[in-house]
From Swiss-Prot:
It comes from Burkholderia pseudomallei (strain 668). The glycine cleavage system is composed of four proteins: P, T, L and H. Coiled coil: none annotated. This is Glycine dehydrogenase (decarboxylating). Belongs to the GcvP family. Its EC number is 1.4.4.2. Pfam families: GcvP2_C, GDC-P. GO terms for biological process: glycine decarboxylation via glycine cleavage system. One of its GO terms (molecular function) is pyridoxal phosphate binding. The modification N6-(pyridoxal phosphate)lysine is found at residue 723. GO terms for cellular component: cytosol; glycine cleavage complex. It comes from the Bacteria.
Length: 975
């Protein structure tokens, strides 16, 4: 049956109320092509219906027999209905004043940053800045982040964010293992490190043979450790002078990692000045809500000698084709997409959007404002200490920045009861102690309430705050020897945007430089840059989600946990597995968790020797990097000429490693953009040799509602909620990478013993700092699924496949489509082969990518999985009009290439070799090129009315790596 145009329905009268109700309205907003457009594209492909196309694309042997079993969410909700339902869940949460601390603090998000960064699609819909010429705004914001972290830590170089403080500490551990003394496998963790950090470190250390020892910091130098982790200030609030200890550790051949509070570093001597080799931490308290644990931007800073070992993205300064400063991602050869199992880390997505928020918090407040905030926090803590001592309590720590640990003896339970009555959470530090951490939001009234609670428990009257303040010596809590004397944030960017007017204009100037989904489609293969709907994003800013501490009592988080349970069941339905954990806070971490689960399963069966992981040659680089981190040996399986797993080679490798085979990691549909016909056979071969099947869920957008990895042989998968389920990419994070497993693996799902979170009774431990990972962005995916319902989620998948095949069909006469399935069809993406073009014209895939910028497009994925190709994924959200605009651009570029091939254009002086063209170049007095200015800037007529100008010319990557500079650029350099 052909799709019926909705206008025809409107001509039928009378229409019932049921016919006029708009439960499907959101799906019509989310799916780009309307019925008429879809039919036109189907006609181009030679299919009468979408169903007929899908039958031809997906092997019948793996098709889902039943409708997506979403239970109460099977029927779509309107945007208003979904928001109301989620509001009802949010209202079940109780927003208490939280003084739990432990790395999470209340903070004020400046409204100008909330509205113009977090709520601005120009920022949150952007992709990781692999194409630097159209990413200069967010690259500058991330460079500000790096400068901020380097300044505050006192170390030479910082990366552009990591996932959370605990995983950053684990990354520091493995960094120091690579550079440390080879005779030691011991990593020593001081006993006042945050408990969630220690737990993640233990999880990360076990599979790679690192022995974690924990004890008093004073014993660290004698531990013969390659690295030592110190907390500054400590978990109990104590501020210790570690200078002599750091010297002793270095003398013993070890290195020092310091987990440092970013706000405290505005008033405390930075770790880089007293011996730290690496500093890690969290920037959450720089304007990012707690959000029940995330997302937040962690940081890592290192000494210059370790810069090539540092994980994560690194923004560096280079020059463009005109010799002007330009920013780019530096030292990319460290990363998993290039070095695979030899990479420094498996991290792809980090926390770019949150890093940008934190950096803008520093820009807005400046060094003076930040120090004022820190001094006020410290003063409130000092007044609290004076008051409770006046009431007869003793503090465990005499020195502190913002945290007190208090001996409360038999009054402890009563204190917590009094606090609960005032809707206050104190930290439960054992049966006889209470912890209190104050923050930027703590007011005089809050301090009075805290003193009243302690006074009630003591049977006394709370002391007067003004009297305490008048009698308190300046800064009594910080050791004078550790007072910060060095300057920080001296660069002009941190000292000029302090009025809201200036800040607003600065943010606008940066966002105008970038190309995000709010301007045009981003056809990146394997990235699924679909719509991030406004209604999905709205709940992220609700205080009922944002102001919840991850370690708050369970009775205060009922709504959160109910929403999370519902989302887990939605994902179970989509994947065909039995259970899901949402703890992994990136796809890379979901991969890693899945492999640890496989290892735990084998171990439980007395087969811990199984450590070989088969990985197809076409796999994304995170797969081998994750396998290496999980302690597995990577064995590569060949692919055939069509890009499919070579079954003969798979059988040979499985036979050769049968005794030790742990798993195979496959991506489905494959990284070549095809539904492999023999995926069931692949799974059966591995199972026959005792292995487990890991199905990478990066391409889940081609499967939802049509097939499911848990039904065709998969044992475990990770998903990317920031791809398939609409969490935005944020310019390089946040992401969520849930791990989904079959029933036999459910008991091994991640848990967190330090907080009592037990998802699996034999769980692998914690893989992120918070029990539910990046919990505050989970409502985005909940909203998407609730508003789509089963039928429309399936329709979205079908439309994504339709759009990809339409592009492949239209572009095939101009660019060979490298891989396809039966009938010449592809899955949800297609690979265009540009290698013959390079041979005939000298034009490279890089030239085409840069030229697309002149046409107003972000390039498709370059040279993955095959060098010299472009991988195009349009998603279901792009209209036929936008697809046609992209197709027209690609055809026009092919004509420009043909001019070079035929000698009508010079092989060097042509629009592709000099792309992208900036406004400054096009309007300069001199025009040295054989082609016209109009051809350079306006190659198609549509650009005259709506033109995006790349802010810089082509970035010189080699120059940037040869002359590595990863700090803010002086204003004079832009002159």
């Amino acid at each position: 049956m052909k799709l019926e145009h909705p206008d025809r329905l409107m001509n039928r009268t009378p229409l019932s109320l049921a016919a006029l109700e708009t439960h499907d309205a959101f799906a019509e907003r989310h799916i780009g092509p309307d019925a008429a457009s879809q039919q036109a594209m189907l006609d181009t492909l030679g299919f009468a219906t979408r169903a007929a196309l899908i039958d031809a694309v997906i092997p019948a042997s793996i098709r889902r027999a039943e409708t997506l079993p979403l239970g109460p969410f099977a029927q779509p909700k309107s945007e208003a209905e979904a928001l109301a339902a989620l509001r009802a869940l949010a209202d079940k949460n109780q927003v208490f004043r939280s003084y739990i601390g432990q790395g999470y603090y209340n903070t004020h998000t400046p409204a100008v940053i909330l509205r113009n960064v977090l709520e601005n699609p120009a920022w949150y819909t952007a992709y990781t800045p692999y194409q630097p010429e159209i990413s200069q705004g967010r690259l500058e914001a991330l460079l500000n982040f790096q400068q901020m972290v380097a300044d505050l830590t006192g170390l030479e170089i910082s990366n552009a964010s990591l996932l959370d403080e605990a995983t950053a500490a684990a990354e520091a551990m493995t960094l120091l293992q690579r550079v440390g003394k080879p005779q030691s496998n011991v990593f020593y963790v001081a006993d006042d490190v945050l408990p969630q950090t220690l737990e993640v470190i233990k999880t990360r250390a076990k599979p790679i043979g690192i022995e974690v020892k924990s004890g008093p910091a004073a014993d660290a130098a004698a531990a013969n450790a390659f690295g030592v982790l110190l907390q500054y200030p400590g978990a109990n609030g104590d501020v210790r002078d570690y200078r002599a200890l750091a010297d002793a550790i270095h003398a013993a051949g070890g290195h020092v990692v310091v987990a440092a509070d970013i706000l405290a570093l505005t008033v405390l001597m930075p770790p880089g000045e007293w011996g730290a080799d690496v500093a890690v931490g969290n920037t959450q308290r720089f304007g990012v809500p707690m959000g029940f644990g995330g997302p937040h931007a962690a940081y890592m800073a290192v000494r210059d000698e370790f810069k090539r070992q540092m994980p994560g993205r690194l923004v560096g300064v280079t020059v463009d084709a005109q010799g002007k400063p330009a920013l780019r991602l530096a030292l990319q050869t460290r990363e998993q997409h290039i070095r695979r199992e030899k990479a420094t880390s498996n991290v792809c997505t980090a926390q770019a959007l949150l890093a940008i928020m934190a950096s803008m918090y520093a820009v807005y407040h400046g060094p003076r404002g930040l120090k004022t905030i820190a001094l006020r926090v410290n003063r409130i803590a000092a007044l609290l200490a004076a008051g409770i001592r006046h009431l007869g309590y003793a503090t465990v720590n005499d020195t502190f920045f913002d945290t007190l640990t208090i001996d409360t003896g038999a009054r402890t339970a009563q204190l917590h009861a009094f606090a609960q009555a005032k809707r206050i959470n104190l930290r439960r530090a054992g049966d006889t102690r209470v912890g209190v951490s104050v923050d930027e939001t703590t007011t005089r009234a809050d301090l009075a309430d805290l003193l009243t609670i302690f006074a009630q428990a003591a049977g006394a009257t709370a002391p007067d705050i003004d009297a305490l303040d008048a009698g308190l010596l300046p800064a009594p809590a910080l050791p004078p020897s550790l007072e910060r004397t060095s300057a920080y944030l001296t660069h002009h960017v941190f000292n000029r945007h302090h009025s809201e007017t200036e800040m607003l204009r600065y943010l606008r100037s940066l966002s105008d430089k970038d190309l995000a989904l709010d301007r045009s489609m981003i056809p990146l293969g394997s990235c699924t840059m679909k719509l991030n709907a406004t209604s999905e994003m709205l709940p992220v800013t609700w205080p009922e989600f944002g102001r919840i501490h991850p370690f708050a009592p369970a009775e205060q988080t009922v709504g959160y946990r109910e929403m999370i349970d519902q989302l887990e069941q939605m994902l179970v339905a989509a994947t065909g597995y039995a259970a899901v954990s949402l703890q992994p806070n990136a796809g890379s971490q979901g991969e890693y968790a899945g492999l640890l689960i496989i290892h735990a399963y084998h171990e439980s069966r007395g087969e811990s020797h199984r450590d070989v992981c088969l990985i197809p040659a076409s796999a994304h680089g995170t797969n081998p990097a994750s396998a290496h981190m999980a302690g597995m040996k990577v064995v590569v399986v060949a692919c055939d000429a069509q890009g499919n797993v070579d079954i003969a080679d798979l059988k040979a490798k499985a036979d050769a490693h049968s005794h030790d085979l742990a798993a195979i990691m496959i991506t489905y549909p494959s990284t070549h953009g095809v539904f492999e016909q023999n995926v069931r056979e692949i799974c059966e071969i591995v199972h026959a040799h005792g292995g487990q099947v890991y199905v990478d869920g990066a391409n889940m957008n081609a499967m939802v509602g049509l097939t499911a990895p848990g039904q065709f042989g998969g044992d475990v998968s990770h998903l990317n909620l920031h791809k398939t389920f609409c969490i935005p990419h944020g310019g390089g994070g946040p992401g969520v990478g849930p791990v989904a497993v079959g029933p036999h693996l459910a008991k091994f799902l991640p848990n967190q013993r330090s907080t009592g979170y037990a998802r699996g009774e034999d769980g692998i431990g914690a893989v992120s700092a918070a029990p539910y990972g990046s919990a505050s962005i989970l409502p985005i995916s909940w909203m998407y699924i609730a508003m789509m319902g089963a039928k429309n989620l399936t329709a979205a998948t079908e439309t994504a496949i339709l759009n990809a095949n339409y592009i492949a069909k239209r572009l095939a006469p101009h660019y060979p489509v490298l891989y396809s399935g039966p009938g010449g069809l592809v899955a949800h993406e297609c690979i265009l082969d540009l290698r013959p073009i390079k041979d005939s014209s000298g034009i490279t895939v890089d030239d085409v990518a840069k030229r697309l910028m002149d046409y107003g497009f972000h390039a498709p994925t370059m040279s993955f999985p095959v060098p010299g190709t472009l991988m195009v994924e349009p998603t279901e959200s792009e209209s036929q009009e936008e697809l046609d605009r992209f197709i027209a651009a690609m055809i026009a570029i092919r004509d420009e290439i043909r001019a070079v091939e035929e000698g009508r254009a010079d092989r060097e002086d042509n629009p592709l070799r000099h792309a992208p063209h900036t406004a400054a170049v096009v309007t300069a007095n001199e025009w040295p090129h054989a082609y016209s200015r109009e051809q350079a800037a306006f190659p198609v007529a549509s650009l005259v009315a709506n033109k995006y100008w790349p802010p810089v010319g082509r970035a010189d990557n080699a120059y940037g790596d040869r002359n590595l500079f990863c700090s803010c650029v002086p204003v004079s350099d832009y002159a």
